[in-house]
C-alpha cells in the first residue's frame, strides 16, 4: 500500500525557496561596483547549448532564453516572435519582432532563429519529444515557416521547452540572448556574469557571481557569514530557520509538476473502487504541510492552463 500511495497521481506545484541579505526592518545600501554573490546547488560545467540538460542550466544562469517563455501569470510570451499562425495540420508561420539582438549586437532575424532551432533539433534528441524533429525555414528576414513531424496543438508551448534556446557561434565560443554574458567561468565551481548591453534595462544590472554550494548547511553558514548576498534553492527547513532569524525569505513557483502514473490494467489498482477509496483517503493538504510548500493539483496540468 505504501508503494501505491507513493505513486498515486497527486502532483503538487513545486516551490523554490531563496533568502536574500538584509532584515525586514533595515535596508542595506550596496555600492554599484559591488557584485551580487549568489549561492546555489550547481554551476554549469560547459557552455554546450545542445548537450543534454545544459540549455536549461544556461537559461537559469541568465545567459540564454527560449523562443517563448511563461510569465508570472502563466501566459506564453516571447521577446522574439510577434505572431504565430497555423496554416495546416503540420505547418506554422512565425512573424518575428525587429530589433531584438544577440549579446554581440547582431540581430535575431529569421536566418539566425532558424539556424539555432534546426541545430537544436538535430543535435539534442531531447528537443524531439513533443512533435518529433521540427524544421525551421527562413521565408524572409522576419518570417519563418515551421514544419512539425507530429501534430501539436500549441507551437508556442513547444518553443518554450527548455531545449529550445536561441544561440549562435562566435569566434570565441557561443553567443546567446539572455540578460547576462560570461565574464569568467570556473566549471562547476563559480560563474561571474556581467550585463548584456543589448538586453533591455541592462543599465539597472550589475555584476553577478554564482557559486556552487551543494551542501545546504554550508550554504546557510556562507549566507550568515556574509559571503553570500542570496542563497537560492534552500530547503524548507533552512528557510524556516533563516526566517526565524529575521532574514528575508521568499518562495517562487518552480513552474513544473511531478507525476506518478498508476498501472490500472492489472493488479489491485485495476479495481476502480480501490482507486476511488485511495483517492478519498488521502489528505492532500497534509502533503503540502509535510513538504512545506506547493499547491494541491486541480488536474493533469497547471491551473493557468
Tell where the protein language model's regions lie, with residue ranges.
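Gly/Pro-rich hinge or "lid" segments in bacterial periplasmic/extracellular proteins
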Residues: 75, 151-203, 207, 217
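Ligand-site clamp/hinge motif
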Residues: 196-240
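Surface-exposed binding/hinge segments that line
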Residues: 85, 89, 128-169
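C-terminal motif of bacterial Sec signal peptides marking the signal peptidase cleavage site
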Residues: 18-20
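N-terminal lobe/hinge region of extracytoplasmic solute-binding protein
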Residues: 39-87, 118, 175
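Local pocket/hinge segments that shape ligand/substrate recognition
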Residues: 235-305
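Bacterial signal peptide processing site
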Residues: 22-24
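Aromatic- and charge-enriched surface segment that lines or borders ligand/interaction sites
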Residues: 82-124, 268
Amino acid at each position: 500500500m505504501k508503494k501505491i500511495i507513493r505513486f498515486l497521481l497527486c502532483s503538487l506545484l513545486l516551490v523554490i525557496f531563496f533568502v536574500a541579505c538584509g532584515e525586514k526592518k533595515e535596508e542595506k545600501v550596496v555600492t554599484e561596483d559591488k557584485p551580487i554573490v549568489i549561492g546555489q546547488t550547481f554551476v554549469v560545467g560547459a557552455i554546450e547549448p545542445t548537450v543534454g540538460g545544459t540549455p536549461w542550466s544556461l537559461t537559469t544562469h541568465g545567459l540564454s532564453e527560449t523562443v517563448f517563455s511563461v510569465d508570472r501569470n502563466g501566459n506564453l510570451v516571447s521577446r522574439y516572435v510577434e505572431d504565430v499562425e497555423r496554416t495546416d495540420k503540420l505547418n506554422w508561420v512565425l512573424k518575428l519582432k525587429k530589433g531584438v539582438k544577440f549579446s554581440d549586437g547582431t540581430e535575431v532575424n529569421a536566418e539566425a532563429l532558424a539556424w539555432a532551432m534546426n541545430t537544436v533539433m538535430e543535435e539534442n534528441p531531447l528537443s524531439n519529444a513533443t512533435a518529433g524533429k521540427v524544421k525551421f525555414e527562413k521565408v524572409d528576414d522576419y518570417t519563418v515557416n515551421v514544419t512539425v513531424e507530429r501534430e501539436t496543438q500549441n507551437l508556442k508551448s513547444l518553443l518554450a521547452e527548455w531545449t529550445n534556446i536561441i544561440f549562435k557561434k562566435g569566434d570565441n565560443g557561443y553567443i546567446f540572448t539572455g540578460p547576462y554574458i560570461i565574464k569568467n567561468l570556473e566549471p562547476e565551481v563559480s560563474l561571474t556574469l556581467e550585463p548584456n548591453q543589448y538586453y533591455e534595462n541592462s543599465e539597472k544590472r550589475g555584476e553577478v557571481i554564482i557559486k556552487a554550494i551543494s551542501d545546504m548547511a554550508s550554504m546557510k553558514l556562507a549566507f550568515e557569514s556574509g559571503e553570500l548576498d542570496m542563497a537560492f534553492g534552500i530547503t524548507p527547513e533552512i528557510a524556516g530557520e533563516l526566517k526565524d532569524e529575521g532574514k528575508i525569505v521568499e518562495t517562487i513557483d518552480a513552474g513544473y509538476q511531478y507525476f506518478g502514473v498508476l498501472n490500472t490494467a492489472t493488479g489491485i489498482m485495476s479495481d476502480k473502487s480501490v482507486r476511488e477509496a485511495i483517492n478519498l483517503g488521502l489528505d492532500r493538504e497534509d502533503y503540502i504541510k509535510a513538504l512545506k510548500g506547493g499547491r494541491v493539483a486541480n488536474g493533469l496540468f497547471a491551473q493557468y492552463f
